[in-house]
Amino acid sequence: MSLVFIIMAIAGYLVGAIPMAYLLSRWRRGIDIRRYGSGNVGASNVVKTAGKRLGLAVFIFDVSKGAVMILLSGALGLALWQQIVVGLFTIAGHNWPVFLRFNGGRGIATSLGVALVMAPVPALIALGTAIAFGLFKKMAPGVFLGVAALPFMSGYFHGFFGIREYQTISWGFIGIFLIMVTRRLMAPDNEYAHTVSKAELIFNRMFLDRDIRSRSVWINRNSAPAEESPNIL
């Protein structure tokens, strides 16, 4: 195991751990995003609590974290499996950032950045699936299905998509899926977690990315302050 690989894995975690959603919300709105909206430290909650422009800035940054770390690892001569591990460390850093006491976002945008470099076409199909579901306000199930489909797309349709080293890519996608599911299931407990059965809670968290079925109740349970600061963009 090379020193460069170890350094890049650690760097990936630290870069991933930069909580841009938290930082920009603090700077531009003066709020702790973990206390408002869904409580998620990610672009979607920034859109809800701080506006679309700020949310777009966070989304671009989070996607770039994953993509840049994979590309840099490749430029340094790391093997494909090592590049993927660096990408997974970057996603883990976003989800469990040391700077926020290991309570971060869901890592979807960062995972997209990693996936776009690993296998662009399947990643775009997964993104399209999430967007299609999002049009009907079902983004979380769309993300779940899109990410779950990635290993199958790379494994069974690698020839069609022109994916080399597809077995390694498929294992990388499985890693992304497992990290996503683990993060959803490890969401902090709240008052709603005790209003449903254990089985329903697991289903809701894993598939819907919330503790209860009602999306509107979930995302509006903590409203952001009314006062607005000037937009960053």
UniProtKB/Swiss-Prot annotation:
GO biological process: phospholipid biosynthetic process
This protein's UniProt keywords: Cell membrane, Lipid biosynthesis, Lipid metabolism, Membrane, Phospholipid biosynthesis, Phospholipid metabolism, Transferase, Transmembrane, Transmembrane helix
Protein name, UniProt field: Glycerol-3-phosphate acyltransferase 5
Transmembrane segments: 3-23, 69-89, 116-136, 143-163, 168-188
Keyword Repressor: no
GO terms assigned for molecular function: acyl-phosphate glycerol-3-phosphate acyltransferase activity
Topological relation to the membrane, as annotated: Multi-pass membrane protein
UniProt-listed Enzyme Commission number(s): 2.3.1.275
Matching NCBIfam families: PRK14417.1
Protein's pathway: Lipid metabolism; phospholipid metabolism
